[in-house]
C-alpha cells in the first residue's frame, strides 16, 4: 500500500499529480521488479489523474538514445542527470523500501524536500 505520513494518499493538487519513483538500484538484485511492482500498485490504488515516472523505463529510453547517438551505454552520472531532470518536473516522490541505503535515492529525496514535493512511502503487501 502507498502511504504519505501514515495516511492514504489524496490528490490535493488542481493539476495532475506527477509521481517519481525513487529507491536503490546499485547492488539491488531485483530492483526492476521492485520498481515495476510499485508502479503497478500506484496505478491500482490511486484513483485520480496521475503520471508515474519509473526509473526502469527512464533507463531503457536513455540507454536506447545513448546507443544510437553516442555509441556507448550511459554512466552512473548520465543516469542520475536524466533522473534528476525528470524528478524536477514532478510534484511528488514515492520512496521505496531501503531507499536510505542508496546514495542516488538520498539525493532524490533531498531534491524533493527542497522543491517542496509531496513525499510518499511505498511498502509491498
Residue map of PLM features:
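Conserved catalytic or regulatory cores that recognize and/or transform ribose-phosphate-containing ligands
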Residues: 1-125
Amino acid at each position: 500500500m502507498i502511504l504519505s505520513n501514515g495516511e492514504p494518499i489524496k490528490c490535493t493538487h488542481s493539476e495532475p499529480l506527477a509521481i517519481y519513483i525513487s529507491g536503490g538500484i546499485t547492488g539491488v538484485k531485483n530492483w526492476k521488479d521492485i520498481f515495476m511492482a510499485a508502479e503497478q500498485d500506484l496505478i491500482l490504488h490511486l484513483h485520480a489523474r496521475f503520471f508515474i515516472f519509473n526509473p526502469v523505463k527512464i533507463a531503457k529510453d536513455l540507454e536506447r538514445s545513448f546507443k544510437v547517438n553516442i555509441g556507448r551505454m550511459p554512466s552512473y552520472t548520465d543516469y542520475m542527470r536524466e533522473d534528476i531532470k525528470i524528478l524536477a518536473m514532478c510534484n511528488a516522490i514515492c520512496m521505496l523500501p531501503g531507499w536510505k541505503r542508496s546514495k542516488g535515492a538520498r539525493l532524490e529525496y533531498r531534491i524533493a524536500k527542497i522543491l517542496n514535493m509531496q513525499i510518499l512511502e511505498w511498502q509491498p503487501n
